[in-house]
């Protein structure tokens, strides 16, 4: 992390399974076991996804979401369900377009062994919301609101089974507890963090008829403290 950048440029990248480039900004995903955990990190929960929508990428229709003691990780199935894909975050664009049989074969070869992988570290998470399904209008799709280097970034996923208010309450407990463990001063946000950690926070009604959980404390102080903790346990 540099003095100039405390938050991510983007929320994911398309790479080969097992790639370990820029580990603070992007997760490493193993083809068989899923995300590679960092030293001291524990896996808490995972579920299958039926839809993944991230700015800068085509919508993906299968993957998994993982929650650990440090981050929320999203990974697609092997990246072979579309003919076009892109990536954000300073690693350049990856484009595969197929118009003929030959170009389709070349594109397929380029996609082989690749996966979309992204994570939201808890120190970047502004909040999250349950949104109404576009067809049934029932609550279920999950939107993560993430502080990015250039502003707020949204990632939206749909789970199988659906995400619930009980699950969101649990996620609030995990994120708030991790944030408070950093030992920084959250000022007026301290009380709400305590409510989230205790599971007693009442979510807000959103403008589209969903429910929202705002997590106070995202900022320079929190990001630096979390990065120092990560570097202490992860860097050689």
Q: What positions do the PLM features span?
A:
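Polybasic, Ser/Thr-rich intrinsically disordered tails and inter-domain linkers
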Residues: 1-34
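Acidic, Ser/Thr- and proline-rich intrinsically disordered linker/docking segments
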Residues: 2-9, 73-236
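Intrinsically disordered, low-complexity, compositionally biased regions/tails
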Residues: 14-16, 22, 44, 102, ...
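Alpha-helical interaction segments
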Residues: 14-16, 34-36, 157-160, 220
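Compositionally biased, intrinsically disordered low-complexity regions enriched in proline and serine
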Residues: 25-27, 46, 228
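The phosphoinositide-binding surface of pleckstrin homology
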Residues: 31-60
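A broad, low-specificity signal marking well-ordered, structured residues that form hydrophobic/aromatic
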Residues: 43, 65, 142-144
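Polybasic phosphoinositide-binding surfaces of eukaryotic membrane-targeting domains
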Residues: 56-83
